[in-house]
């Protein structure tokens, strides 16, 4: 397997993890496994007795006592397997990345910068695993839901790992002239998209998408009254305020992309084409976001909305791989 093929496999596994993670959240499966066993946890329950033990552990959680007290044995098996599969793909990703890392460090003629990026990605991957359990643990104590802050952190770590590997995967593009405009647009949009992904994690954690399911107004108001009551850091605990911020951030991102598109017509064709791609994808992403809201978070559209955010990040990273020659 070549170096870039290995990176591509890792990137696809990250996207798979993001998709499965979103499905896990939307089906309320994430708290079904009450323990974190990085090694022995790879083996699922194989007997009826083992399944019953896992079910009994789940019955002691706040989620079961408050929300899922009527769940059947078969329904528990479903949500358990969803969470199990999410963790399994994470283990596969970690194994594939670590084996490839060792192999290419030994036999590959990697530049120092590539080695540093891969080591950073390894550290990020380890942190991401701990953050995942840190998030799940928050929903096993008193409240029957994970901390929305920890969920947002978990999603942000995934996006950061994704950006690092995409950057390493993409081959540098050499152009004539200055690359300032490329890097300015890429860095600006990457930063704003990262903030938007964090806000999206907060929206998901608070289930804020089920509140004010109207567009463009929020239950008849552009500025909901709730946001004026929460003009502090506490606004991140208020579902209405968080959804408002997520909407405004989406408007800002789309506006900036369209402004960049207009400005790009004064530059070369390659730059114009890349900006057009970003602007088009941003409009499509906003469209999926609106559909997710209006149809009360259907799983298929919600997952597409989440994956599109990562695809947009990947396109923005490509701006940083342009070099002057």
Curated annotation (Swiss-Prot):
GO MF annotation: an example: oxidoreductase activity, acting on NAD(P)H, heme protein as acceptor
Binding site for heme: 246, 305
Catalytic reactions of this protein: Fe(II)-heme o + 2 A + H2O = Fe(II)-heme a + 2 AH2
Pathway note: Porphyrin-containing compound metabolism; heme A biosynthesis; heme A from heme O: step 1/1
InterPro entries (alphabetical): COX15/CtaA_fam, HemeA_Synthase_type2
Record keywords: Cell membrane, Heme biosynthesis, Iron, Membrane, Metal-binding, Oxidoreductase, Transmembrane, Transmembrane helix
Top-level taxonomic group: Bacteria
Location in or out of the cell: Cell membrane
Protein name (Swiss-Prot/TrEMBL): Heme A synthase
Organism per entry: Neorickettsia sennetsu (strain ATCC VR-367 / Miyayama) (Ehrlichia sennetsu)
